[in-house]
Amino acid sequence: MTSYLWFLLAAVFEIAGCYAFWMWLRLDRSAWWIAPGLLSLVLFALILTRVEASFAGRAYAAYGGVYIVASLAWLALIEKTRPMLSDWLGAALCLAGAAIILFAPRLHTS
């Protein structure tokens, strides 16, 4: 269960870090946005190592579903744009895939 919390926290920092660069490069905001963006992305990387997984690639793949849902929440809460039904349907499919990756029985460790 703690992996979900780490995934969610990682998503917040990754999205915030990327959004800081979006602010600078796409919305013509100050280059000072780079500093919090870099800090946020470093925290994202550190936090993602806390996930209970034997292999990095599997952790990243499972995290992808959480990232997509968190991105849609960011769209709604920060950018004040309502996600469309197709956004939520796509996110649901991705979460299903992430759940399969996360919960599938492991017959082999490689």
Swiss-Prot record:
- A single Gene Ontology CC term: plasma membrane
Pfam families from the UniProt entry: UPF0060
The compartments listed are:
Cell inner membrane
Q: Which residues cross the membrane?
A: 5-25, 31-51, 59-79, 84-104
Q: Write down the SUPFAM superfamilies for this protein, in alphabetical order.
A: Multidrug resistance efflux transporter EmrE (SSF103481)
Topology of the protein relative to the lipid bilayer: Multi-pass membrane protein
Note the InterPro entries from the entry: UPF0060
Q: What keywords tag this UniProt record?
A: Cell inner membrane, Cell membrane, Membrane, Transmembrane, Transmembrane helix
Check the record and name the Gene3D superfamilies matching this protein: 1.10.3730.20
- The answer to whether the entry has keyword Transmembrane helix is yes
What the record says about family reads:
Belongs to the UPF0060 family.
- Protein name per its UniProtKB record: UPF0060 membrane protein Pmen_1247
